Amino acid sequence: MNTILELHNLKKYFATQKAVDDISFDIQQGDIFGLLGPNGAGKTTLIRMITGIFYPDSGSILFEGKKFDPINDARHIGYMPEERGLYRKMKIGEQALYLAQLKGMSRHEAMQKVKLWFEKFEMQTWWHKRVEDLSKGMSQKLQFVTTVLHEPKLIILDEPFSGLDPVNANLIKDEIFRLAKNGSTIIFSTHRMEQVEEICDHIALVNKGKKILDGTVKNIKHTFKENHYQIGVAVLPEHLMTHIFKVISAQSDSLLVQLFEDTRTNDVLRYFINKNIDVYSFKEVLPSLSDIFIKLVNGSPEARQFLSINHNHE
């Protein structure tokens, strides 16, 4: 797999404040890459450097193995910012055509693509409406279409599901998977952990302008696992005092336990067999990305903010 984007030791200052502080990571072609962090973490500044809106104060960006050229390479990038960039007084069909032509498409080619996407998203009747007449969710769908219709190699989506109902959120999600399958690379910037776990292959977690970690979602969760297991049982044993695991929580037919360091899973199963208790499920529980973030930043205000946001959406 080819590396499409490389960030090397990027730094960006605003006056004396470090918005991005020595961040490096690579993104592979066809990946769905999650860029995570609380508000003010540096995500938007990082994205604006990747798209050529800002220049880094130091460090380098390589696009397809060459030094990033903001003028020429930007045409291969589709960017959907969190603060939506649509012209409110302009008619929707003309706006989509105009934005496609800005990315180098002929009007004829743009017309074909816009009609295709409008039909796919059931937007055909919107053509003569103005953006100011659209709901937030409708504006979101239009912004997504104008971001991807020129078939960019790199697609950057900043909070793309904001304001969408579940049906349209799933529609966008399916398109993200399809675009990645067809070779587009997607950067998904968000503070919503559950969406990242569902969608992304790789992630980078940033806080206060610094990268805290990056890697595959699977590897990160396995790195931070704590020997937690969910055990489904026919009945709870009367006494749960044991030297092989600690009970974290108990319900009428299940236990969440943490195995002690030298305990094997067979030891746990043997414990219940000896008590004549049937075990009907036994599953390792990996930490959520939200749990990992909280652990890494160790109870900071950013961690509390992140915890509140993500628990409110669970």
Predicted features and spans:
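Short, charged/small-residue-rich alpha-helical element at the C-terminal edge
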Residues: 227-300
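ABC-family P-loop ATPase nucleotide-binding domain
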Residues: 1-11, 299-314
